Amino acid sequence: MRFTLSLMTCSLLSCFGASSPEPVQVGSAVPAVTCNDQTGQAVDVAKEGAKGLLLVYFYPKADTPGCTKQGCSLRDSWAELGKLGVKVFGVSTDSEADQKAFKEKYKLPFALLADKNKEVCKAFGVSTTLGYASRTAFLFRDGKCIWVDPKSSTSDQASVVLSFLESQTK
């Protein structure tokens, strides 16, 4: 009986594309991966994160309640993040068109990466379930990971990041 249940569980996870890659950890380099943003422009994530601060946050689906709160949290704290020189990329498995509509609807001031093939998720070790990225956030300084939020908050995303950065200056 246990064998049958185990076999069924593995089969279901395989069919629905659940994956659990090894995640980026504090001290890791920014993964070398390129992905199109909401305009179709290719973004070299490692190049963008080589100097200064880069926040890369993953969310399951554009224009859904939790993901909207997360993006708007960062938008609403954009001035504070900007003073600290934080660049931001939001990443989901949505299409470029969906990312563009999400960005425009909520006036998000940062790029949204359309990771349709899940290459960015794989490079960062972010798991996907049923094709959706797990909510996770990474902060890099000069090409190295300095902070990971494995469950990444929604409405408090910006305040959590800002609190971490403030703790680093004390």
Residue ranges and their predicted role:
Residues A133-K170:
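Thiol-/selenol-based redox modules, centered on thioredoxin-like
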Residues L5-S6, C10-T34:
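N-proximal helix/coil linker or "cap" segments that precede and/or mark the start of modular domains
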Residues K47-T68, L74:
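Short active-site neighborhood of thiol/selenol oxidoreductases, capturing the structured segment around
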